[in-house]
C-alpha cells in the first residue's frame, strides 16, 4: 500500500500571466481576490465573476454582463474557466446518472443521484486509489494521481451545467455533495479542501456544511489536520467490527487500527458543527465475512463511545472480487441487533447498480458490456443475450 499525505499548501499561481492562462476553477475566493488584485481590480470583481461561474455555470467572460468590456478583455488574455469534459453518460432505470469525465488522458467517474427531496452528487478526488480495499472496484486499478481543484470542483460544475444551474432553473440542481467517489480524499487535502471551500462559499455553490460530506477509510494524521481547516460532515468507511477482519479488507487498518481511527473521529466531532455531534458509519455487508449477528454485537460494543448513525451498505459485486453480497435476511438480522442497542441504523438503497454507478463500483474506465454481464451473473440475474 502506497500512502502519501498531501497537506494543504496551495501551489496554484494567482499572478496573471499571458503565457499560461490560469484556470479560475482552481481558485477559491481568497485566491480569486488575490488574482483580481494583481490585475489591478477591486475584490468585489472576483465575487462577481465567481457568481457567474457557479450560480450560472458560465464559462464565457463575454456573457458576464455586469463586468465591463475592458476587464472582460483582460480576463480573456490571462484566464479561462475550463471544467473537465464528459466523455460518456449512462442513465440508470432509477434515474441515477453516471458520467465518465476526462481528466487529462485519464478518466474519473461522477454520479448524480436524484431523489424526491434532494439531489446528491458523488465526486471523485483521485484517479484510482492507493488504499487497496479488497471489496472496492476502484482499488483494483491502483493509484495514478491526485485530482486538481479544477478537476474536483469541475465535476460539480459540469453536473450543474448539465442538470441546470441554480440561477437558470430557479432551483438548486445539486443539494448535497459526497466525497465518496474514486480515491481517498484525505490523501489529497491540497486540492480537496479548496474544492470544498468553493462548494460551501456563497459565491460558489453555496451548500450548507451539513450537506457536504467527506468519507475516509482512516488516514488518521490527515483527519486530525482536516478538523483545523474546514468543517464538513464526516462519514467513515469502517466495514468491520474488529481489527482482524478490517486488517484483511481495509489494509490501512494495519497502520491506523480501529481504536486509533475512532479516537481521531471523536476529536473531529469535538471541533465540528456540521456533524451535529455524530459521525456516519459506513459498513459494507459481505456475505459470511462481516455480516453475522456476532459481528453486529461486536460492532455495537465497539461504537458505544462514538456518537453515530450506521449505514449498512449491500455490497455491489464486480468481476474478480472474492466476496458475495449478504442476503436480505442476514442484513435484516444485523440491523435489528444494532437497533436493539439504540443505534440509528439505515440499510442504504442501492442506486445505479445497473450502470455500475453504485457504491464501490466506480472504476474510471467506461465499463464495457462484458464486465457488466459478469457482474449480473455474479448476482444470479438472468441476462437476455440480445440486450447485451
UniProtKB/Swiss-Prot annotation:
Gene3D superfamilies: 1.10.150.530, Aldolase class I
Taxonomic source organism: Salmonella typhimurium (strain LT2 / SGSC1412 / ATCC 700720)
Catalytic activity, reaction form: adenosine(2503) in 23S rRNA + 2 reduced [2Fe-2S]-[ferredoxin] + 2 S-adenosyl-L-methionine = 2-methyladenosine(2503) in 23S rRNA + 5'-deoxyadenosine + L-methionine + 2 oxidized [2Fe-2S]-[ferredoxin] + S-adenosyl-L-homocysteine; adenosine(37) in tRNA + 2 reduced [2Fe-2S]-[ferredoxin] + 2 S-adenosyl-L-methionine = 2-methyladenosine(37) in tRNA + 5'-deoxyadenosine + L-methionine + 2 oxidized [2Fe-2S]-[ferredoxin] + S-adenosyl-L-homocysteine
Role according to the record: Specifically methylates position 2 of adenine 2503 in 23S rRNA and position 2 of adenine 37 in tRNAs. m2A2503 modification seems to play a crucial role in the proofreading step occurring at the peptidyl transferase center and thus would serve to optimize ribosomal fidelity.
Record-given protein name: Dual-specificity RNA methyltransferase RlmN
Active site: 109, 359
Record keywords, A-Z: 4Fe-4S, Cytoplasm, Disulfide bond, Iron, Iron-sulfur, Metal-binding, Methyltransferase, rRNA processing, S-adenosyl-L-methionine, Transferase, tRNA processing
Pfam family, one: RlmN_N
GO MF term list: 4 iron, 4 sulfur cluster binding; metal ion binding; rRNA (adenine(2503)-C2-)-methyltransferase activity; rRNA binding; tRNA (adenine(37)-C2)-methyltransferase activity; tRNA binding
Amino acid at each position: 500500500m502506497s500512502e502519501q499525505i498531501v497537506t494543504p499548501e496551495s501551489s496554484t499561481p494567482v499572478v496573471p500571466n499571458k503565457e499560461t492562462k490560469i484556470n479560475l476553477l482552481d481558485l477559491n475566493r481568497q485566491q480569486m481576490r488575490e488574482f483580481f488584485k494583481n490585475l489591478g481590480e477591486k475584490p468585489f470583481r472576483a465575487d462577481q465573476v465567481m457568481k457567474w461561474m457557479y450560480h450560472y455555470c458560465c464559462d464565457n467572460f463575454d456573457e458576464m454582463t455586469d463586468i465591463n468590456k475592458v476587464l472582460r478583455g483582460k480576463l480573456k488574455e490571462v484566464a479561462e474557466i475550463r471544467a473537465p469534459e464528459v466523455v460518456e453518460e449512462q442513465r440508470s432505470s432509477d434515474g441515477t446518472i453516471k458520467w465518465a469525465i476526462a481528466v487529462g488522458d485519464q478518466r474519473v467517474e461522477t454520479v448524480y443521484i436524484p431523489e424526491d427531496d434532494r439531489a446528491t452528487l458523488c465526486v471523485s478526488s483521485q484517479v484510482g486509489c492507493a488504499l487497496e480495499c479488497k471489496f472496492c472496484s476502484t482499488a483494483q486499478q491502483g493509484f495514478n494521481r491526485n485530482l486538481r481543484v479544477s478537476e474536483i470542483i469541475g465535476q460539480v460544475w459540469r453536473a450543474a451545467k448539465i442538470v441546470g444551474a441554480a440561477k437558470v432553473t430557479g432551483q438548486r440542481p445539486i443539494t448535497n455533495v459526497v466525497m465518496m467517489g474514486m480515491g481517498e480524499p484525505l490523501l489529497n487535502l491540497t486540492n480537496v479542501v479548496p474544492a470544498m471551500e468553493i462548494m460551501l462559499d456563497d459565491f460558489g455553490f453555496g451548500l450548507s456544511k451539513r450537506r457536504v460530506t467527506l468519507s475516509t477509510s482512516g488516514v488518521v494524521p490527515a483527519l486530525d489536520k482536516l478538523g483545523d481547516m474546514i468543517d464538513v460532515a464526516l462519514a467513515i468507511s469502517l466495514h468491520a467490527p474488529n481489527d482482524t477482519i478490517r486488517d484483511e479488507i481495509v489494509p490501512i487498518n494495519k497502520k491506523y487500527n480501529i481504536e486509533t481511527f475512532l479516537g481521531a473521529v471523536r476529536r473531529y466531532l469535538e471541533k465540528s458543527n456540521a456533524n451535529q455531534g455524530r459521525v456516519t458509519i459506513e459498513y459494507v455487508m459481505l456475505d459470511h465475512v462481516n455480516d453475522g449477528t456476532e459481528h453486529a454485537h461486536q460492532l455495537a460494543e465497539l461504537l458505544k463511545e462514538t456518537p453515530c448513525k450506521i449505514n449498512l451498505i449491500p455490497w455491489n459485486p464486480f468481476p474478480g472480487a472474492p466476496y458475495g453480497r449478504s442476503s436480505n435476511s442476514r442484513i435484516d438480522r444485523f440491523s435489528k441487533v444494532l437497533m436493539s442497542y439504540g443505534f440509528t441504523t439505515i440499510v442504504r438503497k442501492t442506486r445505479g447498480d445497473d450502470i455500475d454507478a453504485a457504491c464501490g463500483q466506480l472504476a474510471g474506465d467506461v465499463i464495457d458490456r462484458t464486465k457488466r454481464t459478469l457482474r449480473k451473473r455474479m448476482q444470479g440475474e438472468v441476462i437476455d443475450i440480445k440486450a447485451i
